[in-house]
Amino acid sequence: MDFSQRFGVIVIGGGHAGTEAALASARMGVSTLLLTHNIETLGQMSCNPAIGGIGKSHLVREIDALGGAMGRATDKGGIQFRVLNARKGPAVRATRAQADRELYKAAIRGTLENQPNLTLFQQAVDDLVVENGRCVGVVTNMGLRFMADAVVLTAGTFLGGVIHIGLDNHQGGRAGDQPSNALACRLRELPFRVDRLKTGTPPRIDGKSVDFSVMEEQWGDNPLPVMSYLGKVEEHPQQVCCYITHTNAQTHDIIRSGFDRSPMFTGVIDGVGPRYCPSIEDKVNRYPDKDSHQIFVEPEGLNTHELYPNGISTSLPFDVQLQAVRSIRGFENAHITRPGYAIEYDYFNPQDLKHSLETQHMPGLFFAGQINGTTGYEEAGAQGLLAGLNAARLSQGKDAWTPRRDEAYIGVLVDDLITMGTQEPYRMFTSRAEYRLLLREDNADLRLTEKGRELGLVGDERWAAFNAKRDGMASEEQRLKTTWVRPKTPEAEAVNALIEKPLTHEYNLLDLLKRPELTYANLAEAVALADRPDSAVIEQMEILAKYAGYIDRQADEIEKLRAAETTALPVEFDYGQVKGLSNEVKQKLSEIRPQTLGQAGRIPGVTPAAISLLMIYLKKHHHQKKAAQQA
């Protein structure tokens, strides 16, 4: 049976990628259908109850700057907020929020249900409708056909999902949910490169059975940060304490005793796990000389006693899990409410995608989230937003848009995946970005919101708030540039008390703010500066003053590299014609098909010398072609 309404975009999956994809498409005015196997699990946090962290909060802010939901939902559901790397430079500072699972999920669902142009429908998808090599719809498990101009697939861990606890395993997309096996089989018939990855989760613990008095308390920051540019501290629910405890030598002995029944060490699991979030058995095996590993004990919510012991993800047999947990300080009488487990699932080589996240082999089909080999809610949400907006633009007959590496961490994420691929779950870090001083958490709106408005992603409320901030920055910068402090005045004496060497000639306030001893607050106090602006404007003034030289230098580097970054490589380019390229380089370039010289240069094994040869070849043939046309 065919559904009566045709949609512009269909999104399969209601996780973090799927919800951002559906919302982005609908915000752009395109009729959008979100299909999920269970409406009650929309926006569910399947693993840890937290959003943000190093590199990840940068993605959340970028999603937010483009009108996405993750940041706002975090402010409404966050029960502890902390700024990580607060004493380091602004490029690596990151906000992390502990979230109440139910409050977060409710915020996402409310956003979905109130979004114009968006329809929700509860049905699992078993098949794709393909006509003339193009994806034009989907078929649900009850045979209902939905047709569309574009389809975004965000299946998470559900494609061929297998859950492992010890040597026992069963099919599942996550605990309590069936996998999408029919769809997984259908996708394996298509010309995509498919492999397996693994992720895991720790056992959950009943807080009533835990002795918190022997653990280290970890409270959130005060004053409280916010995650969204539109966020307000008043939106935050009650704030709670997290705790820290540690494994010990006894814990590690218990874990080692279960290695012979571990699916990881007996070859039962083939998939590769996340390097930066290893299981506790992997850590014990990899670091045999380490007697202790830190565990963050995180509340799951305000209305539950369940705890998430971050740091002991495991797929060991349940009896080993229970013994290991009870050997940990504070957990001696712990009751496990849900066992930890590992899950194996299908993912598809992201090198088979375009930068728009549309698949190369099937027009109209987009992939986003863990299906592309990433791990993390934030990475999924960022891909979902990009896939959703480009699916909508395809429906509108418009060209795709993807941010460059120097514009956004979203650009870094997508370019890394497509240029280099991944053989393990990919996680974002600030170290992955060459231009991280320009791609800060605090300026994602200044980088992206204007473009988001142009794309149709940003609504009036966000646009007004952005303009107020931008205008405030311009006004304050002008004021600081034109307010002078002259030697031997009361203002100069007040400033001299804060700095090592006294002022010998006049300075404007912006130049004074470049000095490491001075902050906006103590400088404004010293010169009795009235009518101080919003804290976000003050933050920008300090960063732009103190890091001006570094920021200008990075901007110059970007400008120099822009030529290579934008030099297009023809789709059917014959790399065999370029003399001097090694067979390895020819093979990699022919396989990956980079779109630009800049992208080609980031492929492992493609040397700067090879890029120079390509550049010379392109210039030579461009001139030959031009001469032939003139003749």
Swiss-Prot record:
Annotated binding of NAD(+), by residue: 273-287
Record-linked SUPFAM superfamilies: FAD/NAD(P)-binding domain
Record key words, sorted: Cytoplasm, FAD, Flavoprotein, NAD, tRNA processing
Residues involved in FAD binding: 13-18, 125, 180, 370
A GO cellular-component term linked to this record: cytosol
Lyase is among the record's keywords: no
Entry's Gene Ontology BP terms: tRNA methylation; tRNA wobble uridine modification
Compartmental location: Cytoplasm
Any one GO molecular function term: flavin adenine dinucleotide binding
PANTHER family: GLUCOSE INHIBITED DIVISION PROTEIN A (PTHR11806), PROTEIN MTO1 HOMOLOG, MITOCHONDRIAL (PTHR11806:SF0)
The protein's role, per its UniProt record: NAD-binding protein involved in the addition of a carboxymethylaminomethyl (cmnm) group at the wobble position (U34) of certain tRNAs, forming tRNA-cmnm(5)s(2)U34.
Subunit text: Homodimer. Heterotetramer of two MnmE and two MnmG subunits.
Family recorded in the similarity comment: Belongs to the MnmG family.
Name this polypeptide is given: tRNA uridine 5-carboxymethylaminomethyl modification enzyme MnmG
Organism: Alcanivorax borkumensis (strain ATCC 700651 / DSM 11573 / NCIMB 13689 / SK2)
Gene: mnmG
